[in-house]
Amino acid sequence: MTTPRTGKPWRHLLVWLHVVSSTAWMSGAAGLAILLGLSRSDPALAGAAVGAARHLDVFLLAVAANASASTGLVLAWTTSWGLVHHWWVAAKAAITLVQLYAGIAILSPVLDELVAGGTPAPAAQVAGAAAMASAVAFQAWLSVAKPWSRTPVARRERARGRTKLPPAGTPLVAAGVLAPVGDVALTVALGVPAPLLEVVVLGVVGVARRRALTRTAPAAAAPAAPAGAVPPAPAPRGS
């Protein structure tokens, strides 16, 4: 049986991996902005700068972003904070998803075109990379300050008698640690970002936690007896 003590090392590893990957994501985005800015300031270095930026994007920024997102979501799902029970957690998750979409659908394709043409980066590309680094820094502040109140979801659960979410078991937490490590190996082997294990683990953790929380949901409180009602007499004891 899993106890809080046996699961603690895995939870510490998950928090550590989230901090490290988030720091790498922010640093990679800042480095990307610098390289893209260099391609604009010196046309002679444009090809080399955007080439280096693409390698940074594929082998650091994308890997770190995927790991930061997956570990952050697993942390939210498997701890008492919950994913949609506190506004600061929900805000971090929303910002992360927006950044992943922007990186995958906008920034990376443009970067591939720049490498193919050896052309300087447009100003919007530099601004996008800088905005990504700033957004990760803001998320770090949210983790430290934990501003704002509980969400309506948390208030409804509190009204039903659940004041705190129970933590998940060790297997789910351990999966959240091991999946990013496995995907790093896949990325190195394939040469492209491959968050396959992280996507699978997120699906498993999300479904498992939803089922577990549904099973342990507190029963609705019984209606209060009307004023003046006589309580039932106790049943007679057997001889």
Residue map of PLM features:
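Polytopic transmembrane helical bundles with strong interfacial aromatic enrichment
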Residues: 1-41, 48-239
